[in-house]
Design a protein with these regions (language model features):
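Subset of outer-membrane beta-barrel
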Residues: 1-256
Length: 256
C-alpha cells in the first residue's frame, strides 16, 4: 500500500514509518431466486499487517468476514414505454475485529451498507438513458472521545472505551445506527450519496456523468465525474474523469 508516516505525541514525538500490507482471499456464491431477484454471499479471509518494523508492539492480525447482497430487476411501464427498474443492496465486511497490539485494542472492520436504485428508459430501439442513485453508510460505531480532563471525565472515558473495545461486531453494526454525538442529524451526515446519468447507443457506446457527496466531517469527498465507455462482446472499457468541488481533494482532476 506504500509508505506512511505516523506522527505521535501531537507531532512532537518520533515519526513511525509504516509499510501496510493487506491481503484478502474470497469465495463467493450467487443464485437467482426468481425471475427478477437474485442474491449472493461471499466469505473472506483477511491478512492485515501495518508493517511497523521499528515498533515491536505492532503485530499482524487475521480476520474473517462475509458479504451479503441482493439484486432485483424488473420491467415497469412508464407512460407508453417499458422501462427497466433495478434495486440492489450490499452489506460488506461483516466479520471479526482486528488487533495490531496482540489483543489489547480491537478495531472494527469497515463494514458498509450500500443501497441503490436505477431506471433505464428507452428513447427508441437503439438509444437509452438511465438514472441511478446510490446511498452508503459505514456500519461501525462511533469511537468514544474524552470530553474533559477531570478524574471523573477520565474514568467515564475509560469505561466507554473498554465497552467499545469489547463490543462484538454484530452489536457494533446495530449501534452504528444511533450512536452519533450529534443525534439524528449526525447519523444523516454519515450517509454518502451519489447520482449518475448514463446514455447508451445500442448497448455498445456509453456517455456518463454524476456527482458524489460525502459530508465534510466524514471525509469531505465531493466531486463531479464525466466518463465514457465502449463494449464489444465480452470486452468492455470504461474511463471517468473526476472534478472536485472542494479544496485539497487528492481525487481532483484524476482519471479512473
Amino acid at each position: 500500500l506504500g509508505e506512511v508516516q505516523e506522527s505521535r505525541d501531537g507531532g512532537m514525538g518520533n515519526q513511525l514509518i509504516l509499510n501496510p500490507y493487506e491481503m484478502a482471499f474470497d469465495v463467493s456464491y450467487s443464485r437467482k431466486l426468481s425471475d427478477v431477484f437474485s442474491m449472493a454471499v461471499a466469505l473472506r479471509y483477511i491478512r492485515s499487517d501495518m508493517g511497523a518494523s521499528s515498533d515491536a508492539d505492532m503485530v499482524p492480525d487475521n480476520a474473517f468476514a462475509a458479504d451479503i447482497a441482493g439484486y432485483l430487476e424488473k420491467y415497469v411501464i412508464l407512460g407508453n414505454s417499458e422501462c427497466l427498474w433495478s434495486f440492489g443492496f450490499n452489506v460488506s465486511n461483516i466479520g471479526t475485529k482486528v488487533s495490531y497490539d496482540g489483543g489489547n485494542t480491537n478495531q472494527f472492520l469497515p463494514t458498509m451498507l450500500k443501497v441503490g436504485t436505477g431506471l433505464l428508459y428507452p428513447i427508441d430501439d437503439y438509444n437509452q438513458i438511465g438514472i441511478y442513485v446510490d446511498l452508503s453508510k459505514y456500519l461501525v460505531p462511533t469511537e468514544p472521545i474524552q470530553e474533559g480532563t477531570t478524574p471523573e471525565d477520565e474514568a467515564a472515558y475509560k469505561e466507554k472505551h473498554d465497552e467499545y473495545n469489547n463490543m462484538s461486531p454484530i452489536t457494533g453494526i446495530f449501534k452504528s445506527f444511533g450512536d452519533s454525538p450529534n443525534g439524528f442529524k449526525g447519523e444523516l451526515e454519515e450517509i454518502m450519496a451519489s447520482i449518475g446519468l448514463e446514455y447508451n447507443y445500442n448497448q455498445q457506446f456509453f456517455v456518463r456523468g454524476g456527482y458524489y457527496y460525502e459530508n465534510k466531517y466524514q471525509g469531505n469527498r465531493q466531486y463531479f465525474s464525466v466518463g465514457a465507455g465502449f463494449r464489444m462482446s465480452v470486452f468492455q472499457l470504461d474511463a471517468a474523469y473526476l472534478i472536485s468541488t472542494v479544496q485539497s481533494n487528492p481525487l481532483d482532476q484524476t482519471l479512473r
